[in-house]
UniProtKB/Swiss-Prot annotation:
Entry coiled-coil feature ranges: none
Source lineage: Bacteria, Pseudomonadati, Pseudomonadota, Gammaproteobacteria, Enterobacterales
Presence of the UniProt keyword Cytoplasm in the record: yes
A molecular function GO annotation: ATP binding
GO term, biological process aspect, one: arginyl-tRNA aminoacylation
Keyword set, alphabetical order: Aminoacyl-tRNA synthetase, ATP-binding, Cytoplasm, Ligase, Nucleotide-binding, Protein biosynthesis
Quaternary context: Monomer.
Main location: cytoplasm
Known EC number: 6.1.1.19
Species whose genome carries this gene: Salmonella gallinarum (strain 287/91 / NCTC 13346)
Name this polypeptide is given: Arginine--tRNA ligase
Length: 577
């Protein structure tokens, strides 16, 4: 259930009855402090200004029309005209009971949409590096959240699988008598890429052959298509190992590489010319956009076809957006691409809108993110200053987690230790990233991310096992517990219950904004509130069975919420730590 939405509806009706316009915004928010209640309606300021009256006067009139019987125990006006709403304990009890009867914890399903999510996007013939981490795991958390809410999500892994470099790679493989590329590991291809580039730059005859191979590949020659396909297959097989290690839901079926849009490009250029949007300029085909100005203050020219007939990333991105709307029938498209690509995407989408390829009713959203930095505040690198391979980073996470869990669990079996180390190590790397606002850069710090204190994966995983341990200690009759009422009489019980019931509101924000850090902050808050509740409200030694069972049910909803919340982030939980 979405309590915020319920209260917004009620306050909005009362505001309209008090003379506010029909489109008024009640601005119901979760209260920041306990003394301000559970929710606060802040919309009186803006509306009162329009009506030419004092906000407090409007708030008083709104209260005469506001019926929250059975929902709120107290409603009061604070400051210049804020309305503070305190939830009724009986209402909280009823909602906790409802949440426990459903696998979805009472989370309702919004109108189902088809949502395309573009994320990860590694390059062919190169190994994934830390630069791919943020897009991959933030995008996957968004996908998991949207799917949980009931949307039809299409994962789009926009792999870099086309371009002039393929002529160079095929020529080099051939020169090395390595046509049987299927037997090579990707680490070999990394070396091949470097060697091929060196040869291409230094040997004109080789470079000429590579250029000819590109033409043959692009014209659909069977042999060259087969060689190209081998390179793609080796890369994606290797990448799948990384995705599986990361507990990311991408599969081979989600690959929609640049090559997919290639056949569309000549038609796009011809159509943009026919619509008068693209013109010839110095031999190239260019779209001049008034929305973007160059240094001289003139409309910026965006090249969509070079003088030599080649296409650019912008052309591919135009085709890509068109395909996602026309062929995939997207109602919404999300792009998890770093912030440096923002202007490029905005230009492509401006052309897409002008050409009528995607209507304004279908949002194209750039959910950009900052960079991953080392402790020195510079881009995260190896000691030698090279790019950190993602597989190496995950190996190190696992090794550090092994040491950590072995130290804390000297008697655990080797199998159990390995499973636990995997959950903690991979979870720590992912959670450290997901818990930060994606729009900012963040410092990668092993010590912080593997700590058992603070907003970290190990702390959250431990908090979950701590709740489960209550049930292990209690000799519970499941049936008796299912039918037991929830009684909320203590402040800490009410605070925990109210926060647990804000799970749907949190999911809604993550789904709307693509901000997993909001879920991390929520779960951390729930864990903290449970800790206080556990300390001050005895569960197993409660004064009677009714109170004990009621508190066990609050603990049960806490465990289910933590598990489901961490699952939407792609963080594994464990039963014992």
């Amino acid at each position: 259930m979405n309590i915020q939405a319920l209260l917004s509806e009620k306050v909005s009706q009362a505001m309209i009855a008090a003379g506010a316009p029909a489109d008024c915004e009640p601005q119901v928010r979760q209260s920041a402090k306990v003394q301000f209640g559970d929710y606060q309606a802040n919309g009186m300021m803006a509306v009162a200004k329009k009506l030419g009256m004092a906000p407090r006067q409007l708030a008083e009139q709104v209260l005469t029309h506001l019926d929250l019987s059975g929902i709120a125990s107290k409603v009061e006006i604070a400051g210049p005209g804020f309305i503070n709403i305190f939830l009724e304990p009986a209402f909280l009890s009823e909602q906790v009971q409802q949440a426990l009867t459903s696998d979805r914890l009472g989370v309702s399903q919004p109108t189902r949409q088809t949502i395309v999510v573009d994320y990860s996007a590694p390059n062919v013939a190169k190994e994934m590096h830390v630069g791919h981490l943020r897009s991959t795991i933030i995008g996957d958390a968004a996908v998991r959240t949207l799917e949980f809410l009931g949307h039809h999500v299409i994962r789009a892994n926009h792999v870099g699988d086309w371009g002039t470099q393929f002529g160079m790679l095929i020529a080099w493989l051939e020169k090395q008598q390595q046509e049987n590329a299927g037997d090579m590991a990707l680490a070999d291809l990394e070396g091949f890429y470097r060697d091929a580039k060196k040869h291409y730059d230094e040997d004109e005859a080789f470079a000429e052959r590579a250029r000819n191979y590109v033409v043959k590949l692009q014209s659909g020659d069977t042999y060259f298509r087969e060689m190209w396909r081998k390179l793609v297959d080796i890369t994606m097989t290797q990448n799948q190992i990384t995705y599986d290690r990361l507990n990311v839901t991408l599969t081979r079926d989600d690959v929609m590489g640049e090559s997919l849009y290639n056949p569309m490009l000549p038609g796009i250029v011809a159509d943009l010319k026919a619509k008068g949007l693209a013109v010839e300029s110095e031999g190239a085909t260019v779209v001049f956009l008034d929305e973007f100005k160059n240094k001289e203050g003139d409309p910026m020219g965006v090249i969509i076809q070079k003088k030599d007939g080649g296409y650019l990333y912008t052309t591919t991105d135009i085709a890509c957006a068109k395909y996602r709307y026309e062929t995939l029938h997207a109602d919404r498209v999300l792009y998890y691409i770093d912030s440096r690509q923002h202007q490029h995407l905005m230009q492509a989408w401006t052309i897409v809108r002008k050409a009528g390829y995607v209507p304004d009713s279908v949002p194209l959203e750039h959910h950009m993110f900052g960079m991953m930095l080392g402790k020195d505040g510079k881009p995260f690198k190896t000691r030698a200053g090279g790019t950190v391979k993602l597989a190496d980073l995950l190996d190190e996470a696992l090794e550090r987690a092994r040491r950590l869990v072995a130290e804390k669990n000297p008697d655990m079996s080797a199998d159990e230790l390995e499973k636990l180390a995997n959950a903690v190590g991979i979870g720590a790397v992912k959670y450290a990233d997901l818990s930060k606002n994606r729009t900012t850069d963040y410092i990668f710090d092993w010590d912080n991310m593997l700590a058992f204190e603070g907003n970290t994966a190990p702390y959250m995983q431990y908090a979950y096992t701590r709740v489960l341990s209550v049930f292990r200690k209690a000799d519970i009759d499941e049936q008796a517990l299912a039918s037991a009422p929830v009684i909320i009489s203590e402040d800490r019980e009410a605070q925990l219950a109210a926060r647990l019931l804000q799970f749907e509101e949190t999911l809604t924000v993550v789904a709307r904004e693509g901000t997993p850090h909001v879920m991390c902050a929520y779960l951390y808050d729930v864990a903290g509130l449970f800790s206080g509740f556990y300390e001050h409200c005895p569960i197993l030694s409660a004064e009677n069975d009714a109170v004990r069972n009621s508190r066990l049910k609050l603990a049960q909803l806490t465990a289910k919420t933590l598990k489901l919340g961490l699952d939407t982030l792609g963080i594994e939980t464990v039963e014992r730590m």
